[in-house]
């Protein structure tokens, strides 16, 4: 039995209706998926492309950085603007990676101001160093009064002049010797210091030569005069005692005088 054309016509619209309904359902599911993907993060998250910085859905910005040789991230905090979060990331990168760090901003972030106590101490130390290095003020040189003499400049010379001088050497002595038949007499004369100092050297040499010659002459004539002097002394002694050797009585009386007398010696002493 062949189907009728009316039945085929009714089945075709039914199939088209089922296909359209299924396509509409699939399109609705795809629309819900796109809406959820568009709702992640803040509205300005795609506007700023800073490393380690992202925006929350309520508008705040957060920053975090990956530590070296670790898979974990270090939380840096929440900030009001994207620039503040980027500066926080740059500071952390400099501390962790040093000069190899990749920074978000071209210029390095400014360092925090020092506390007031350390700033005051640094200012005080700088002022003290400046005061210590500064030279003391110079005083003007006043002219010296004319009636004052700088005696201290001549102190070494004055001390040299006040040193005791050695005593002058004794004056030379002149000797004159004379010889006679019985005795030899020697006289010594000392001329005044002024004459001795002024006398030339030739006079002193002549006096010494003459004195030496006279002394040698006296020594040569002394043995000859000794015998004659002894004979003369014996003759004078005999004349004084009056003894001629003729009478024995006179000879005995002469012996009395020749003996030593101890009592007489006491009186002589």
Curated annotation (Swiss-Prot):
It holds the Pfam family AP2. Keywords: DNA-binding, Nucleus, Stress response, Transcription, Transcription regulation. It is found in: Nucleus. Residues 49-106 bind DNA. Residues 1-53, 106-153 are annotated as: Disordered. CDD domains: AP2 (cd00018). GO terms for biological process: positive regulation of DNA-templated transcription; response to stress. InterPro entries: AP2/ERF_dom, AP2/ERF_dom_sf, DNA-bd_dom_sf. Residues 107-117 have a biased composition (Pro residues). Gene3D superfamilies: AP2/ERF domain (3.30.730.10). GO terms for cellular component: nucleus. Belongs to the AP2/ERF transcription factor family. ERF subfamily. Probable transcription regulator that binds to cis-responsive elements of genes involved in stress response. PANTHER family: DEHYDRATION-RESPONSIVE ELEMENT-BINDING PROTEIN 2C, ETHYLENE-RESPONSIVE TRANSCRIPTION FACTOR ABI4. This is Ethylene-responsive transcription factor ABI4. The lineage of its organism: Eukaryota, Viridiplantae, Streptophyta, Embryophyta, Tracheophyta.
